[in-house]
């Protein structure tokens, strides 16, 4: 049996996952992170994208987060997400439409244009599509 660590994924809406996992893979601001038992303690911010959990027995479960923080302590990993969804609950058509709308907003800058808000919307929609692509690869 593989070594496990306790993982919690929570957002403002509440806890979406709590259990033992063999591995947590997340997209940190400085690159991808793979967290397993015995990982050094750390705290880092997370980019929008998938969080992949490898549960006991090798079963994988994927979640989408819109950003947040990851804390690693001995025997514990905690993901504090801005928002979180199970990857299977994402709507690909809505994500593609959001990408198109954000790209259109970036190309049609008006007087009251907020570049950073449009860029954030584009990054989140693109991250949702990446998450959907990742679960298709399973």
Curated annotation (Swiss-Prot):
Recorded superkingdom: Bacteria
Membrane topology annotation: Peripheral membrane protein
Keyword Cell membrane: yes
One Pfam family cited in the UniProt record for this chain: ATP-synt_DE
Location of this chain's protein in the cell: Cell inner membrane
InterPro entries (alphabetical): ATP_F1_dsu/esu_C_sf (IPR036794), ATP_synth_F1_dsu/esu (IPR001469), ATP_synth_F1_dsu/esu_N (IPR020546), ATP_synth_F1_esu_C (IPR020547), ATPsynth_dsu/esu_N (IPR036771)
Record GO terms (molecular function): ATP binding; proton-transporting ATP synthase activity, rotational mechanism
Keywords tagged on the record: ATP synthesis, Cell inner membrane, Cell membrane, CF(1), Hydrogen ion transport, Ion transport, Membrane, Transport
GO CC terms in record: plasma membrane; proton-transporting ATP synthase complex
Protein family per UniProt: Belongs to the ATPase epsilon chain family.
Subunit note: F-type ATPases have 2 components, CF(1) - the catalytic core - and CF(0) - the membrane proton channel. CF(1) has five subunits: alpha(3), beta(3), gamma(1), delta(1), epsilon(1). CF(0) has three main subunits: a, b and c.
Reported function: Produces ATP from ADP in the presence of a proton gradient across the membrane.
Entry-linked HAMAP family: ATP_synth_epsil_bac
Protein name: ATP synthase epsilon chain
Organism: Pseudomonas fluorescens (strain SBW25)
């Amino acid at each position: 049996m593989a070594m496990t660590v306790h993982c919690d994924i929570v957002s403002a809406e509440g806890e979406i996952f709590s259990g033992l996992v063999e591995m947590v893979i997340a997209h940190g601001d400085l690159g991808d992170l793979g967290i397993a038992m015995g990982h050094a303690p750390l705290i880092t911010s997370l980019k929008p994208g998938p969080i992949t959990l490898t549960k006991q027995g090798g079963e994988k479960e994927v979640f989408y987060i819109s950003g947040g923080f990851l804390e690693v302590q001995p025997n514990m990993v905690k993901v504090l997400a801005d928002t979180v969804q199970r990857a299977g609950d994402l709507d690909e058509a809505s994500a593609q439409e959001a990408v198109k709308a954000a790209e259109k907003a970036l190309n049609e800058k008006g007087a009251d244009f907020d570049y950073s808000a449009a860029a954030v919307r584009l990054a989140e929609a693109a991250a949702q599509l990446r998450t959907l692509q990742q679960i298709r690869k399973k």
